[in-house]
Amino acid sequence: MVYTILGEEIFKRGIDKYFELFDGQAVTCEDFIYAMECVSARDFSLFKNWYKTNGTPTVKCEVSNYNEDDGDFVKIKISQFNAKNSNILMIPLKIAIFDANGNPIQMENNQNEKIILLDEKEKEFIFEKKDNKLLAIIDNAVINEVNKNKFISKENMIFSVNRGFSAPVNLDYGLSFESKKILAKKDSDFYNKYNYFKEIILENMLQDVLEDKIDNSLNMAKFIEEVILNYSVDDLSLVYFLRLPTFDDLSEKFIENLPVKRIFEVIKKYETKIAVVLKNKLIELYSYHIDNPDVFSPVNMQKRTLRTKIIYYLAKLENEKNIIEKHYFDTSNITNKIAVLNAIRDIMDVDFYKYFMDDFYNNYRDYHLLIDKWMALNSTTTRDEQSALINVKMIMETSYFNIKNPNNVRALIGGFANNNFCIHGESFEGYSFLFDMIEKLDKINSSVASGIVKTFAKFKTLKKDNKAYIKNHLEKLLENKNLSLAVFEITDKILNN
């Protein structure tokens, strides 16, 4: 934030001053700020409040516009609030402004971005617009001449606020759905672009979860396609726009009656729709970004990440099995092979899935870390409610699983414990199995056992019957007089939280 407030040149001078004054000494954050004050002649008293403020402040933005014969004006009112502390903070906010079509509106000196400083509880910034450009922020004398009562809320200008995460704050900015879409497509700042993209997808998926008759998956797949088409084919950052909200992202929105099965249905529906709508684009990207498995470099890592995500989507399509097979067998890179196993673990063609899983096991059964990954893949399938538990019980009977080996347990039983689709199934068999394992493991390794207990940390958000079953078994755990302290403390905390 200090860099953002001062700019590169003054900040570098501040760093030089800092070493001049304090090199070789035991220093504090305040000493660092003092060096910056020396070279900038700026008072950082309010900035120091960051070092003694708990919680994350919320910055609220309200935008309004009005027109007069002598000019157009746009006002943004920004206020700060922190429920845990009343300290006023110095908050630098990078902003840019776009019109209703997503075109950037230039400000003074032909810049597309400006830094405004919120150093009061509430502050207003008024811009004057001429010739489709926003001039400098009007000074206080002119503001007094502006009739503030004429400002009305309109969205012919869209503010992109806190660009580049210029300040660690929560932003309360009531943008409309359409304005968010414009920023997700056209904003040149990756941080805000991706954040609004995530918000849009999450809002639509959540709507689908809550309303069985609503299906936004096709519209969202087309929206993702529009966002991706704005990227050049060689821009590897577009992989972020192929990532959907996870079960954890969606479940956080519920405080009770968590619809586990419905959430997974919606996720799978969106994944399939994206694969269908973006099929040609995905294949184009996959063919373009060939990674070199023998060269370790950031670029090759990014390419593998992108191709891994593409393989995951293509596995949803029945007629793209050749690409999946080629991706697996034409590489010696384990990351690529595991990407295929991860992509196909939930498909309904069990024979196709088993073909690759058997091949991986037969080739790498002497490599314990790889077999741990293989176990985890078996225990995390969400093909149906029973498959994962059947896999786990079967593997536990084999010679390559050792319940006294923590890595084996974390991979197989820990993997199943994180398989929300299966453990929260209607039969409650997953719960029963895990509670049996907790008691058994507690006698062998209480640390591992307590980790599995944490699976039930949010059980109070589940539906009534699920909650009752889990609560009953957690209470039974506490009645066990031989229970380890580690498991007892975690269990007691979960029950009484």
Question: Where in this protein do the model-derived segments appear?
Answer:
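Acidic, glycine-rich low-complexity/disordered segments
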Residues: 1-5
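Non-catalytic accessory/interaction domains
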Residues: 8-12, 16-355, 368-373, 386-388, ...
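Eukaryote-skewed repeat-based solenoidal scaffolds used as protein-protein interaction platforms
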Residues: 357, 375-376, 380
